[in-house]
Amino acid sequence: MSRQQHQVCGDPNRFQVVADFVITQFGKRVRYIADVAGGKGVLTRMLNKKNLDCELIDPRQKSVKGIKHRREPFLPEMTDYYDLLIGLHPDGALRELGEAALTRPVVMIPCCNFWDQHRRGQKELLAAIKNFYQDNDVRYQEIVLNFKG
């Protein structure tokens, strides 16, 4: 009898791809990581298994067992403790995560446009984020990760 897997929507490989990216880009230079609006905490668990101290920040009550979980909405003021913030499809926390990049390194993989009230398409979303970073002198790099959705 095999153990029950957590059901996820979207490309199930995205968690592994992002975890590998974090290891490759940051390695041991980061110690404390926040998985912002990370749903059930699948990415949090993967990063913990790679010996990184990752904590889920998400107001939803359900999460995988054995992870640290702050059950509250993410606010940019929470960043002092963390070396790196990750938002894999952070939805409603997208804008707050973007603002947190003013003070901390952020890996942000947006999906839906929760940046502003107009909810425009993907190109407009990325342009709005880039403009915000440029206006605030935030260094950023746009990359494409190898997963769908």
For each predicted feature, which ranges?
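S-adenosyl-L-methionine
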Residues: M1-A34, K40-K49
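Active-site capping/gating segments
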Residues: R120-G149
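Short, charged, surface-exposed secondary-structure boundary motifs
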Residues: V64-K68, F114-E124
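Hydrophobic anchor at the start of a short beta-strand
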Residues: D53-I57, V106, V138-Y140
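Anion (oxyanion) recognition and catalysis
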Residues: N48-K49, G98-L102, Q134
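SAM cofactor-binding core of SAM-dependent methyltransferases
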Residues: A34-E77
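Conserved beta-strand signature within the Rossmann-like core of class I S-adenosyl-L-methionine
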Residues: R104-H118
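A short SAM/SAH-binding and catalytic strip from SAM-dependent methyltransferases
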Residues: D83-L97, A101, C112
